[in-house]
């Protein structure tokens, strides 16, 4: 999960009113360009590539019908709720498998920086960031649980594979720490971070680079 900058609302949302219109009436293809502009071709929650996708209501429309067409409540999530076979993570899992939760206890990536709450390990797992207590710790724990960010075996394996693929380069760069001036070494690190800007599981890769010394 990465921090997102929400842009202006798609105009089509202004044509629909909660209580008068149903979500399935809207042409969702007119909403997707703005979602893609905000989050790229990746899931807003797990950062996998959106090969299967749906528009997710952060606060579910069944419980919060007034938010059905509210732009700030919409994200692009992996999984296609129209296809059989279920989906064991992110938006579909949140509202069909996670059990009871309070949306206020979840990280909302367009309002908060997930880096303040979550740390991805080189094993592919994600854990609460070091030093969290109280409400911040609960948010991290509930976000991991409700979106099932560690419990989906396919997701965990894909994330681990992506991280392990860069670890030789990570380890090599860190082996050069004593050979370069700090500014020069940091510039090399920035170059590596730029290379992953458009990669799947970008945050996990970024944490492998930036937190390597503690969690390799």
UniProtKB/Swiss-Prot annotation:
Can you tell me which residues the record assigns to a coiled coil? none
Q: Which UniProt keywords apply?
A: Antiviral defense, Endonuclease, Hydrolase, Nuclease
Does the UniProt entry include the keyword Hydrolase?
Answer: yes
Q: Where are the transmembrane segments?
A: none
> Which GO biological process categories is it annotated with?
defense response to virus
Superkingdom is Bacteria
GO MF terms on file? endonuclease activity
Q: Which Gene3D superfamilies match?
A: 1.10.30.50
Q: What biological function has been recorded for the protein in this entry?
A: Putative HNH endonuclease component of antiviral defense system retron Ec78, composed of a non-coding RNA (ncRNA), a reverse transcriptase (RT), a probable ATPase and this protein. Expression of retron Ec78 confers protection against bacteriophage T5. At multiplicity of infection (MOI) of 0.02 cultures slow growth when infected with T5 but do not collapse, at MOI 2 cultures enter growth stasis.
The protein here is known as Retron Ec78 putative HNH endonuclease
Q: Identify the taxonomic lineage of the organism of origin.
A: Bacteria, Pseudomonadati, Pseudomonadota, Gammaproteobacteria, Enterobacterales
